[in-house]
Amino acid sequence: MKSIVFVALLGLALLAVVCSASEDAHKELLKEVVRAMVVDKTDAVQAEERECRWYLGGCSQDGDCCKHLQCHSNYEWCVWDGTFSK
C-alpha cells in the first residue's frame, strides 16, 4: 500500500515538473512571437521612412518626393507636379 502511494505521489510530482516546463516553453514562444511582430513593425516603419515622401510630406529637394510630386520651394513639402502619366 505504501509503495502505491509513493509511486502515485512521485508520478504527480513528475507531471507537475513536466507541465511547468511546458508552460515556461509556451511563455518563451509567446515572447518570441510578440518580439518578432514588434521588430517587423519597426522594420516596416523604417522602410517607409527610407522611401519617397508622399503628398504634403516634408522635403528639401525634388528627389525626396514620390513620383509625380515635386518639392515646393517656399513651404518645403511635396506637391503635385501636374503630370498624369504612369
Curated annotation (Swiss-Prot):
> Which GO cellular component term is one of those annotated?
extracellular region
* Positions annotated as propeptide: 22-50
| Similarity-based family | Belongs to the neurotoxin 10 (Hwtx-1) family. 17 (Hntx-9) subfamily.
Signal peptide start-end:
1-21
Q: In which tissues is it expressed?
A: Expressed by the venom gland.
Q: Which organism is it from?
A: Cyriopagopus hainanus
Q: What is known of its domains?
A: The presence of a 'disulfide through disulfide knot' structurally defines this protein as a knottin.
Q: What is this protein called?
A: Omega-theraphotoxin-Hhn1a 2
Q: What is the disulfide pattern of this chain?
A: 52-66, 59-71, 65-78
